[in-house]
């Protein structure tokens, strides 16, 4: 079994670091001339996968936009996952789950067990019930060679009230975000060429005093239409092992499959130059 970190390292070398988010919200479906229903969802999502999945290292479906249509939406998500992986892309399912005990284990089984129809290469998780609450998901990821991306420094304006808070008993008065990165540093300590446990750090946070070098990947949402530039990525993440700038709107608003394909190929070339 090849760990997620090793597979991601190879995918970035082959295709480039760009991660494309698949976020079929109602406004975007309307822009495509599609109905805000399961049929519109399916047409949109599968056309995007066909256009870009053979050319990017990672696709990131946002589960909530599929879940809102109930079981039929989940069935579309299952097809998105399967077809993306068949095209050679790694699937990072954006679910941001976080719970304790048996519930945490159930989430792990749903998204990381290869026998599940929702099985993905990696998922996003929330550590704010305490990093140890993620232990069942961490161990399941290890067992199946999957990856995790842990929320650390998000770019939403509400994030700092939790993520910048100082933690009692941490040397130097470290922050919650810094503590999350320390945990990831330990999880990835022996991994080569790249750890499987990553962090979510917004491309638009401006600056940070936190050490982003932890031998694991960084998912950097906010790249492109949300304001993050290639210069921002290089300035903010220069010390990080592998950064995945994540773009959704810049790609999805293009609509034409050939234009989407050319855009992601060109962006990957620019990110690697």
From Swiss-Prot:
SMART domains: OMPdecase (SM00934). The keyword Membrane does not apply. It comes from the Bacteria. It comes from Nocardioides sp. (strain ATCC BAA-499 / JS614). This is Orotidine 5'-phosphate decarboxylase. Pfam families: OMPdecase (PF00215). The keyword Ribosomal protein does not apply. It is an enzyme of class 4 (lyase). The gene is pyrF. Belongs to the OMP decarboxylase family. Type 2 subfamily.
